[in-house]
């Protein structure tokens, strides 16, 4: 049997609890909505273990650089309350179209890579008893968007914002991809911020959401590779990428 509490009407007491519960639920929902207001940011780890991309000047596969930087970008996004999705981190995703499909529903797809240069521009050297290929001629980051992506204009805004944030943080765009002779003649979408058009790039054109590809630096460049492998530098790059995303996806 319920024991009445002196001075309190039972139905009013129950109603108060119900109202309080509803208030808590509403506040929780509002907080959750605020965190996810910018939508999910999908971060694609470029390449996979069986085809790990370019080999760095010191013999490390690109996939490992991509995985480490993507994880740092995700961690910093989450630290700012952003919802994230990491794609391909296990190194088993061998289908390019599967990557944007995995990101379905995300607000933005960022594919993380590290750069090389044309084979004819590379030289040979020996490191730890193994002959390696390197090229010290170019360094710096680059960004790419595809006009075959339905959200390419937003993708371009985000790429430009990321490029601007990287420059503000002290990094330099490579720019050589636009050169007819030493690059691939990739037209500039935003030269100042190191953004190029790459319309046929599969991971971008197959995406249903705004998408961009980020080349963090040139790992066949012996000096730049050392910098890109430094956790402190990686943290600075990730912070700049996140600042750019925050600018274009408020």
Give names to the regions the model predicted.
Residues 16-30:
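Bacterial N-terminal signal peptides
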Residues 38-39, 65-250:
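Active-site-proximal helix/loop segments of hydrolytic enzymes
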Residues 39-59:
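Short glycine-rich His-centered loop
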Residues 49, 56, 62, 114, ...:
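Short, flexible micro-motifs
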Residues 1-14:
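N-terminal secretory signal peptides that target proteins for export/translocation
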Residues 31-38:
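Boundary at the C-terminal end of the N-terminal hydrophobic targeting segment
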Residues 44, 62, 215:
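Acidic active-site catalytic centers that drive phospho-/nucleotidyl reactions
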């Amino acid at each position: 049997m319920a024991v009445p509490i002196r001075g309190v009407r039972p139905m009013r007491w129950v109603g108060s609890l119900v109202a309080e519960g509803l208030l808590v639920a509403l506040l929780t929902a509002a907080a959750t909505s605020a965190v996810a207001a910018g939508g999910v940011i999908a971060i694609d780890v470029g390449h996979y273990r069986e085809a790990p991309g370019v080999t760095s000047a010191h013999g490390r596969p690109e996939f490992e650089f991509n995985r480490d930087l993507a994880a740092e970008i995700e961690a910093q996004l989450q630290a700012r309350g952003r919802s994230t999705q990491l794609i391909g981190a296990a190194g088993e995703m061998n289908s390019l179209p599967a990557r944007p499909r995995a990101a379905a529903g995300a607000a933005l797809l960022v594919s993380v890579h590290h750069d090389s240069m044309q084979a004819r521009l590379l030289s040979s050297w020996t490191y730890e008893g193994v002959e390696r290929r390197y090229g010290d001629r170019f360094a710096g980051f680059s960004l790419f968007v595809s006009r075959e992506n339905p959200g390419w204009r937003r993708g371009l805004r985000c790429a430009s914002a990321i490029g601007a944030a990287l420059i503000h943080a002290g990094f330099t765009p490579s720019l050589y991809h636009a050169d007819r002779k030493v690059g691939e003649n990739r037209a500039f979408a935003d030269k100042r911020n190191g953004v190029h058009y790459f319309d046929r790039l599969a991971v971008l054109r197959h995406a249903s959401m705004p998408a961009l590809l980020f080349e963090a630096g040139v790992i066949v460049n012996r000096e730049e590779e050392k910098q890109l492998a430094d956790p402190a530098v990686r943290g600075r790059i990730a912070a700049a990428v996140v600042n750019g995303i925050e600018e274009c996806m408020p």
